[in-house]
UniProtKB/Swiss-Prot annotation:
Topology versus the membrane: Peripheral membrane protein
Subcellular location: Cell inner membrane
UniProt subunit comment: The complex is composed of two ATP-binding proteins (PotA), two transmembrane proteins (PotB and PotC) and a solute-binding protein (PotD).
NCBIfam families tied to this protein: potA, PRK09452.1
Source organism: Legionella pneumophila (strain Paris)
Record InterPro entries: AAA+_ATPase (IPR003593), ABC_SmlMolc_Importer (IPR050093), ABC_transporter-like_ATP-bd (IPR003439), ABC_transporter-like_CS (IPR017871), Mo/tungstate-bd_C_term_dom (IPR008995), P-loop_NTPase (IPR027417), PotA-like (IPR005893), Transp-assoc_OB_typ2 (IPR013611)
EC number: 7.6.2.11
SMART domains: AAA
Primary site of residence: membrane
Name under which the protein is recorded: Spermidine/putrescine import ATP-binding protein PotA
Catalytic activity: ATP + H2O + polyamine-[polyamine-binding protein]Side 1 = ADP + phosphate + polyamineSide 2 + [polyamine-binding protein]Side 1
Entries under PROSITE patterns matching the protein: ABC_TRANSPORTER_1, ABC_TRANSPORTER_2, POTA
Residues the record lists as binding ATP: 38-45
Length: 364
């Protein structure tokens, strides 16, 4: 069995009487891209600071390469941090910002030159080496911060929401570049974000935080398609949620009632008759049909379209059901497909196929 690079063992962290992290345990593997995901104030950045050594745990232990590092200062740990603010030296050039750590170690000028340009090539900034960092764009400044962090090839790179200040297009480009850089270096990245799309697109595994504890650890596919609880389901992407009661159990299915319509669902949790559950359907799994398209309406819910949002590649629909509940549906847009020419207040039928839903224990 492979020994994890980082082991977080039953970590607690409080500031005064305010608990921040509550019994957090986590292993981080060699060469993986791990994302700590959660809303603001959930403890993810605090955990990053504990790993880096900028904070000390109230209780628990942190191991790097099998060694407990609780008493080691940041400079003795083989980890580097890229901060949200980048923390560059504004009076220095790109080259000198990246070379700073090497000069502190009194590395020879020739070695500094070689290693700095190697790092700048990795982030595609070698042609801007002599430019002052104040003359760079936000994305370029971020690349300088990353080059400076990887100059000594640490085992772990910690990234604290480094993309949050970038515009959408640049943020998307940097997501791809960061993931490619991580693969090229075969370095462990621990990335902090509150952005679900970032986490899903970049990570090998995602750690979902909430109120100082871990809700779920898994691959992007696992946390999206099989959320551990209602918080994860609602935080990772959009979700339509129905509260249902199991009426009957038949073979591998359960039968329930939604909006007065009898529906069958896959019994994924060995649920029993009369048990209350949350039924979750993602917007992209909802199918919307005009009245003229439907002959048999078994297993479908009636509704009317109350909003249409065109997003280029998709059309998002808000459909009001007979109870007044509004659900979201998302369909890929095809300008040549007349079926997607919906009109506001149009009466429609909605459905999803058995097995496309997620069932979770009722949380009240």
């Amino acid at each position: 069995m492979t020994t994890p690079l980082i082991e977080i063992r039953q970590i607690y962290k409080s500031y005064g009487n305010t608990p921040i992290l509550n019994n957090v345990s986590l292993n981080v593997n060699h060469g993986e891209f791990l994302t700590l995901l959660g809303p603001s104030g959930c403890g993810k950045t605090t955990l990053l600071r504990l790993i880096s050594g900028f904070e000390q745990p109230t209780q628990g232990e942190i191991f790097i390469n099998g060694q407990c590092v609780n008493q080691l200062p940041p400079q003795k740990r083989d980890v580097h941090t890229v901060f949200q603010s980048y923390a560059l030296f504004p009076h220095l050039s790109v080259f000198e910002n990246v070379a700073f750590a090497l000069r502190c170690k009194k590395t020879s000028n020739q070695e500094i030159k070689e290693r700095v340009f190697d790092a700048l090539k990795l982030v595609q900034l070698e042609l801007l080496a002599e430019r002052n960092v104040k003359q760079l764009s936000g994305g370029q400044q971020q690349r300088v911060a990353i080059a400076r962090a990887i100059i000594n090839r640490p085992q772990v790179l910690l990234l604290d929401e480094p993309l949050s200040s970038l515009d959408y297009r640049l943020r998307k480009a940097m997501q791809s570049e960061l993931k490619q850089l991580q693969k090229t270096l075969n370095m462990t990245f621990i990335f902090v974000t509150h952005d679900q799309e970032e986490a899903l697109s970049m990570s090998d595994r995602i750690v979902v935080f909430n109120h100082g504890h871990i809700e779920q650890i898994g691959t992007p596919k696992a946390v999206y398609e099989t959320p551990a609880n209602l918080h994860v389901a609602m935080f990772i992407g959009e979700a339509n949620i129905f509260d249902i009661q199991v009426h009957t159990v038949k073979d591998q299915d359960i039968v329930t009632n939604i909006e007065g319509i009898q529906l069958s669902c896959k019994n994924t949790g060995n649920y029993q008759v009369n048990e209350w559950l949350h039924l979750i359907v993602r917007p992209e799994d909802i199918r919307v049909w005009s009245l003229s398209e439907v002959e048999k309406t078994e297993g479908m819910l009636p509704g009317r379209i109350v909003d249409i949002i065109y997003k280029g590649s998709t059309v998002d629909l808000k459909v009001e059901l007979s109870s007044g509940k509004i659900i979201n549906a998302s369909e890929f847009f095809d300008e040549d497909d007349d079926k997607l020419e919906y009109t506001l207040h149009e009466t429609v039928w909605v459905q999803w196929l058995p097995g496309w839903e997620v069932l979770l224990p009722y949380e009240g």
